Amino acid sequence: MVQKEMINKKISQDNSFIQNNNLADFDFLDAKKNSEIKTVSTGSLHLDEALGTGGLPLGRIVELYGNESSGKTTVALHAVASFQKAGKVACYIDAEGALDLSYAKAIGIDLGKLLVAHPKHGENAFALMESLIKTNKVALIVVDSVAALIPKQELEGNMDDQTIGLHARMMSKGLRRVQSLLPESDTCLLFINQLREKPGVMFGNGEVTTGGRALKFYASMRMEAKRSELLKDRFGNYVGIKSKLTVSKNKVARPFGVAFLEIMFNRGIVYEHEVIELALKHNVVVRSDNAYSFKSQNIAIGKEKLFSVLAEKPELFEQIKQLTIKQIHSPPPPAS
């Protein structure tokens, strides 16, 4: 404390700018406080593990991007449901006007507690984000999507007006403003973005996200979603997809984590399968030949029987789930 006062006194004596402008004293960081990152589950255990934090970080910007039908909106809706289950408020900024309320309800979202906004233009959307962040009452803001945030000038102009770079400039200015508010808040800002083809690219990656480079810079996390497989039922009908999510940027944990999500068209991510897969991976449930045991007690013979038993015994499933989540959140063992 004495050292801090001495430093502040010396700076005040040597720098008239600080004296004339009544700037606040410098302070030392609280190492414990600044090392703790508050997170809330994404609603997918596979994705929580891939992120390395156990969920989405509060006070940060996150970008979820990918091609069409890759599961982006489903992942965002599961995050909304997870935040609600944690007792937090979520807002969905539906710039595309394509939010399917029946699908959102099937995923587990309480529609009566969901804030939904339909901004007229991009500047309106950013003004809304600022207002919500300042309240510090909204823990998750989903923006669907960056491509649909049309600048006001473009909206009010004519179709033949030149608007090159207008969208990128709006994104850059808007992100600067909201980013200045986030560090003092408990709000996660999740942007859904799309990929576009770069003209004239013959080699390398020919795809780029919309909205310029600002979102790439300000995002603490970036996740790319790719559809890796179409899922069929026993009659050959398409019932879902398998989506690969890659953490392409991560400023709060290790980057390049990968998660494969099983998404059904009528219900979203198959959470029960994720719990079992990760329980087996972390030895919460142990497999020996075709037998499955939990805490040294045999619970099922065969995987189909295992799913059946856990569906009939929700208290057993809950025990396995909680132990699995604990394993995911545990720090890695020290290197030998």
From Swiss-Prot:
Its main location: cytoplasm. ATP binds at residues 66-73. It comes from Mycoplasma pneumoniae (strain ATCC 29342 / M129 / Subtype 1) (Mycoplasmoides pneumoniae). Can catalyze the hydrolysis of ATP in the presence of single-stranded DNA, the ATP-dependent uptake of single-stranded DNA by duplex DNA, and the ATP-dependent hybridization of homologous single-stranded DNAs. It interacts with LexA causing its activation and leading to its autocatalytic cleavage. One of its GO terms (molecular function) is damaged DNA binding. PROSITE patterns: RECA_1, RECA_2, RECA_3. It comes from the Bacteria. Keywords: ATP-binding, Cytoplasm, DNA damage, DNA recombination, DNA repair, DNA-binding, Nucleotide-binding, SOS response. It is found in: Cytoplasm. The gene is recA. InterPro entries: AAA+_ATPase (IPR003593), DNA_recomb/repair_RecA (IPR013765), DNA_recomb/repair_RecA_CS (IPR020584), P-loop_NTPase (IPR027417), RecA-like_C (IPR049261), RecA-like_N (IPR049428), RecA_ATP-bd (IPR020588), RecA_C_sf (IPR023400). This is Protein RecA. Belongs to the RecA family. GO terms for biological process: DNA recombination; DNA repair; SOS response. One of its GO terms (cellular component) is cytosol.
